[in-house]
Regions:
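Gly/Ser/Thr-enriched, mixed-charge loops and adjacent short helices
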Residues: 5, 126-263
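Generic structural signal for short, solvent-exposed loop/turn connectors between secondary structure elements
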Residues: 23-29, 104-112, 154
Length: 264
């Protein structure tokens, strides 16, 4: 009698979307996350070996890793970082950050980066976005990642491995937020020059209301826009994975009510 084998990670197939990994956090089990981390490590190593352009970290395959404010994101990011380090990659640890900041910092190194985030999804959802040699994955790339994943035997990390994953520390790029702000300032200057205008954000400070929706931008938005010359009124500007005001999704009209009332 033939027995049908179903891989332990078959339930996780639904996480692999068109352009990222995303779904209910209960599917991000320890054995799945650890196996996925090892697959990502292999992908990043291969990306370095086959890169067509030289990297700033010469002869040092590098990956930039960050995470959002969701409760499980830091833990998942640590799994990713540990597997990458064990594979010989240099991990540039951004900690709590935003996806654009991760992408910017990846560009400063080898073009390889990973962000544990579910963007504007509900709090019980988590996910992963990534860059390989400066490019986001295609739908085929995402599915190939899953095919590589099911080639791994599901191994539940033991206590020793989990302790190592949680306790290992990594290099954080020096002054990376200041570097990010400087790049945005240069972009604003270029835009103003292109418009041939005498009025820049430095000459005409304006008031701006920013609703961080308790996401990762809470740690960065005020500093960024203040540097650009704005007087900031901050709403919900503390990272909180419970998202007490509701889903961090600005496309939901009810999530803009507080912002609209403050602007008035």
């Amino acid at each position: 009698m033939n027995t049908l084998f179903i891989h332990p990670f078959f339930p996780q197939k639904s996480l692999f979307k068109a352009y990222d990994i995303r779904g209910d956090v209960t599917l991000f089990t320890n054995d799945f996350v650890w196996s996925l981390a090892r697959v990502f490590a292999e992908v990043f190593v291969y990306a370095h070996q086959t890169a067509k352009t030289p990297t700033l970290a010469v002869n040092k395959p590098t990956v930039v890793i960050g995470y959002d404010a969701r409760h499980q994101s830091q833990e998942i990011a640590k799994y990713m970082a540990y597997a990458c380090q064990q594979a010989g990659l240099v991990v540039q640890w951004l900690g709590l950050t935003t996806t654009p900041m991760m992408a910017f910092m990846a560009q400063q190194f080898s073009g390889n980066g990973l962000m544990v985030t579910a963007s504007h999804s509900q709090k019980h959802i988590n996910g992963i976005k990534w860059l390989i040699n400066h490019e986001s994955p295609s739908g085929d790339d995402v599915q190939q990642l899953y095919e590589a994943l099911i080639g791994y035997k599901a191994i539940v990390p033991d206590d020793g491995l989990i302790d190592a994953i949680r306790q290992t520390t990594y290099t954080t790029p020096k002054d990376f937020f200041a570097t990010y702000i400087q790049a945005i300032e240069q972009a604003f200057t270029h835009i103003n020059q292109a418009k041939l205008t005498q009025t820049t954000y430095f000459h005409a400070p304006q008031q701006i209301v920013i609703d961080c929706m308790h996401g990762a931008t809470s740690d960065f938005a005020e500093a960024l826009f203040s540097q650009l010359g704005y007087c900031c009124i901050m709403l919900n500007a503390s990272p909180d994975g419970n998202f007490p005001q509701g889903n961090p999704d600005p496309t939901q009209s009810n999530r803009l009510t507080q912002l609209a009332q403050t602007v008035k």
